[in-house]
Amino acid sequence: MIAETPAPAADALRSFAPSKAEGLPRRDAIALTLIMLTHGVGQTLIFAILPAVARDLGIADQAVSLIYVLPAIAWSFMTTWWGRHSDRRGRRIVILTGIVGFMLSQLMFAGAALLGYAGWIGAGTLWALILLSRLVYSGLSSGSLPASQAYIVSRVSPAERATALGRLTASWNLGNLLGPAVIGLLTALGVLTPLFATAALALVIWAWVRGCLRSEGPGAGATPAGRLSPLDARLRSSMLIALCGSFAQASLLQTLGFYLMDHLGVATAEVPRAVGFALMFSAISTLLAQTVFVQSLRPMPRTLEILGAGINAVAFLGLILADRLFVIWIATALCGFGYGLLRLGNVAGASHAVRGDEQGAVAGLNSAMWSAGYIIAPLAAMSLHQIDPRLPYIAAMLGTALALTAAKGRKEALEQA
């Protein structure tokens, strides 16, 4: 499937290079891009490899769901802590710690699975070790994104902020796109080979980034302004938009396969292929939104939020009314495009609303809110699906409509940094 997407990927890669007008050195931009790319690939590997390992070694499906949910909860708490920590200690040390966390978690997962395949540990112990590996990732690596965002914000003008942050988030999405290709190439050597390979890649990137990011960044050694609250008057609308957007996206990802079977009657054997194409189209659309669209038009954050929420609401309406698989694919592509605009506008808008000494804290808080939907959706969306397969998407549509209302109801934040 990845071989069919060279043009969007090429367009995205060309747009990663910062313009001369930006204050972010090209060396730093490349380093941050590689970090996010690696995280994106690693995320795809876990979603692809964990089900196979669990089925092979007897871990129950319900137990697997906890491996997703518990680290997501840990991520939402730790990302805010790391964001504040980067305001005090600097961005560089937090970014480097995130790479170490990624490497350790991949090795711990692979090592536990090897012990399981060798018959040295049972399913219960294996589950605990895999869960621990994911908690290590959440605990140490959840600071990578907010610290990287704050690193960029401190070096670019407000006018260039959305485009610079767009390249950062798009590189994670590009990693999600490239992940299946990595899996296809390396699993021929063993199901765990991609985990060892990405851990080795992380070590190389850590050594290179350690030499590239020479500055800790503004805030190193300083006293942070204090804990930010999602109820802060400057941030209430942004945090509400993030929560609604996160819930909508998580509901789509976690119920789509069931929706295809229960609403369209797609055969079980065809579901992985159908969902795979849907997610591929969504990822490509997100990548195009955050690179080609944003880099070309350079809209303001509030405009991005309004466009993204509006497109998402229309896309979920399409999912609700869909009676053909190709309509589902079109709707999920629209969801990806809207999600890309909405999240980017939300991240940039929140950064505009606070002072320079609060950039790490707001980036961490924003990341936590975008993670919260993945905690709520497994229970809420699946419960709604049991009543009617369309209900999760009706709830998601209402959520994006609420996000649209919140975006339209507030003024563009003025730069306070």
Regions from the language model: what does each represent?
Residues 301-346:
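C-terminal transmembrane helical hairpin of 12-TM major facilitator-type secondary transporters
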Residues 8-26, 213-241:
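Juxtamembrane intracellular "pre-TM" segments in multi-pass secondary transporters
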Residues 133-172:
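Cytoplasmic helix-loop-helix junction between adjacent transmembrane helices
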Residues 78-91, 288-301, 385:
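Helix-to-loop junctions at the C-terminal end of transmembrane segments
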Residues 22-72, 237-241, 245-265, 271:
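Helix-loop boundary and gating motifs at the non-cytosolic
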Residues 100-123, 311-323:
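C-terminal ends and interior cores of transmembrane alpha-helices
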